[in-house]
Amino acid sequence: MILPSASEVKDIRPDDIETLAKLDASGLIVAPMENFSDYLIRIEGVMSFTEKVTTELDKSGHFELDEKIVLPAENLIPESIIEEAAGITVPLYGITVCWVPGFFLSQSLGILWGGCSYTDSENNLNLFLVRSSFATRKKWFVYRRDELISHELCHAARAVLNDHTYEEYFAYQTSPKKTRRYLGGCFRTRFDALFFLLPIMTLLIAQISLTIIGRNIFPIWPFWIASGIFPAFLLIRNHCERRHIHRAGANLRKAGISRVNAVLFRSLTAEIKHFAKLKDSQQLIKYINERVESELRWRIIHYRFIADGE
């Protein structure tokens, strides 16, 4: 998909819904309550950053992400590999993300590290890194290259919504594994992982201490209970949030909308939960039409996935 350069963005007209739909199809989603002029300013910034990366790679042979991470030009992920992700993201969410630079990274990696994305909306920074093992392999350890890249590109596309409840849910739907798709939404933030591991590590330390001492100087059962509380909370929360999104999807289908995942991918948590409550199809369509009248984001969603503008 050919995107406009930073200098060409300003030529897009407010009534050019087809071009706006193409930008959306490239993963350049309109932010909540973002108007047309602000959207173009942001897209111009995004394109400028992408062009900046290309220019620096051509000029100096590397791009400096920060003081510790310098990305050489030879580690730039080629378009042919990034395009593998489109086979997953197009049928799921109707996006082919080709504007986010990606690099293979090899230094200081843990055994479980597969990749990550960097997003800074204020500075229009969008970039992702994946393990260098994927430069020559389509699969490494428990990861598939197309799954991992599509996962990171989903984060890049949806970051503008600044809505974290379903962020990991949508990213993990790119996985072919049912277990990963189900459990992926459990960990929303770094604190979820921290509070998950902390009591488990405390239990391990307590158990090792008792083994070394050779006698029970304190009961171990409270540590077992503590280690199970937060994992249970994560599972229950994940189950409840999945029920909301599945009900929302069912109600959208009942209203005659077929590209349900694409619509929900661009929706906020409050909108998703509202869809879950609207069992009356007429009320649901009325709600969407009201959003279309007030938001550019929903105008494009309606054109692409509800009015069959594609």
Segments from the language model and where they lie:
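Pan-zinc metallopeptidase signature
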Residues: R215-E310
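Post-HExxH zinc-binding segment in Zn-dependent metallohydrolases
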Residues: L161-M201
